[in-house]
A protein has these predicted regions:
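Conserved class I S-adenosyl-L-methionine
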Residues: 1-34, 37-45
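A short, conserved alpha-helix within the catalytic core of class I
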Residues: 110-122
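Core SAM-dependent methyltransferase catalytic element
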Residues: 172-191
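Conserved SAM-binding strand-loop segment of SAM-dependent methyltransferases
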Residues: 80-91
Length: 191
């Protein structure tokens, strides 16, 4: 059985960028709601979101299990004329220092064990932007993880960020990039 790193390295070795170079649409549409400063991109992959945040003036740490993906992220940053700080780490054991970031971005990666660490790593007044699949995605069969543990239950994302000020939340089936996706999307502020 392949490790997570082997699996993602294999995917990212393919020519081009697996998800393209343009940032996640939820990030692009809502970046104006996010505080400037130090940012962390969780499961950064090939860097499309990290590079976009850097273009908007963020000092970005991009963490991912795949050194191959992060090498492409550095290349993309160079191409776009910005810098990011790639960090190769297993997110199952990744630790964040207390109140280290003004913004933490998490797109299409779900580790419930990481969420308390994300909360700890966010400064007061800092924000989380988070989007990932909900259980309805399995019925759509338009992509996403295979295992149920990688899907949010209905309203679970709201519960996971209880105690934060919810600035934006949506959950449902949306058409993006020519296909339907069942997602939960959240922007929340640490109070």
């Amino acid at each position: 059985m392949k490790s997570d790193q082997q699996r993602w390295d294999e995917r990212f070795r393919k020519e081009g960028f697996s998800l393209g170079k343009e940032a996640n649409s939820f990030l692009r549409k809502n970046i104006h709601l996010l505080p400037r400063g130090k940012a962390l991109d969780i499961a950064a992959g090939e860097g499309r979101n990290a590079v976009t945040m850097a273009l908007y003036g963020y000092d970005v740490d991009a963490v991912d299990v795949s050194p191959v993906g992060l090498k492409k992220a550095r290349m993309l940053a160079r191409e776009m004329g910005v810098r990011i700080h790639p960090l190769v780490a297993d997110l199952d054991t990744f630790e964040l220092e207390k109140e280290q970031y003004d913004l933490i971005a998490n797109f299409y990666y779900l580790s419930r064990k990481l969420i308390p660490k994300m909360k700890k790593g966010l400064r007061k007044g800092g924000r989380i932007i988070f989007e990932t699949y909900v259980v309805d995605q399995r019925d759509l069969r338009t992509g996403g993880p295979r295992h149920l543990k990688y899907f949010l239950k209905h309203n679970e994302l709201l519960r996971l960020f209880r105690g934060f000020r919810i600035l934006f939340y949506r959950e449902g089936i949306f058409r993006e990039g020519g296909r339907k996706k069942a997602v939960a999307s959240l922007i929340a502020e640490k109070i």
